[in-house]
């Protein structure tokens, strides 16, 4: 076999992988532009508004690991909900926080739990909270809400949730940046909004389940309490997604209910966060793969889609990898006199589609020169992400903490 044929085979295989990733991004970016239908949920779970005789009750969980800098402000802010006080209860799972912080929290009208885990994780915190609440309270809740320690929500957060919550579906609220104090934080916020367009809004627009994002999540209490003990990794949101998809529970994305979330503002924090995500993505893919044949046979489109999501190349790496391969293909085509129209032009066309897809996914209010100029830090961040690949451990269940300060 000649060198030219080997090069063409490698080129084609690489292009298939990259083009598949690009098509996924472009397809759901375009889907996010579709008008919001009055009836966006599957017919089996169309919500009937609550009657006046019953208003939903909520258990609100704040897992907090080394979150002394932000947790008190978040809890005090949340307690200003305009929802009836007797219909919601806040529980903070304080893990490795100071005595001073715990004393302050204990003075508030909440439940403070202080577990002592050998190895901390958000999943363990949620499991501990549900176990304690179910054993020590006679209250029956309709829904459980999961928020991060740095999250800030509007006073009508629970009121708005109560209008759409349904036992047969999970809800993912619109998590958005509460800080953009430097280029890294701004870029992290931009990345999250692109994800919202592609993995949440775009999916819901065509009747598919949204992706979860780790906080701003709402579940039926009975479902959550029955499934939370199945969580066994450092990326509980991906595990929850898999459980929901296997059980046919729809995830509804609510764009109008905002959850303000602190974005990482340092390269070290960015690297830690992305390492956790990349490790979790690989772990989730390996966990979901065995059930994929059954999903294909039964036509479980949402489970198939979620499995594909775990196999996607991280977008910022793809943004650097694709033009690099374009240049390599162009040089190789010139050196070996390969037919350009079937060799390097397909790469440039794929890159153009990728850029178009990303641009479409950026909310219109963020398409400014100021925001786009902040992308100058991207090469440094991509390099950090690339080095993370060397540290991915498929069996590692250790929690990688992201520091919050705002």
Regions flagged by a language model, labelled:
Residues 114, 119-133, 158-232, 275, ...:
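Long helical/loop segments within the catalytic core of UDP-sugar-dependent glycosyltransferases
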Residues 100, 147-164:
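Acidic donor-binding/catalytic loop of UDP-sugar-dependent glycosyltransferases
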Residues 76-87:
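Short, acidic, metal-binding catalytic loop of nucleotide-sugar glycosyltransferases
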Residues 91-102, 116-119, 152:
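A conserved acidic beta->alpha catalytic loop
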Residues 30-32, 312-395:
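Membrane-embedded multi-pass helical conduit in multi-pass membrane proteins
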Residues 1-49, 364, 385:
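N-terminal membrane-anchoring/stem segments of glycan-assembly enzymes
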Residues 144:
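Short aromatic/hydrophobic "clamp" motif used to bind/position activated sugar donors
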Residues 57-59, 89, 239:
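Cell-envelope/extracellular polymer assembly enzymes that use nucleotide-activated donors
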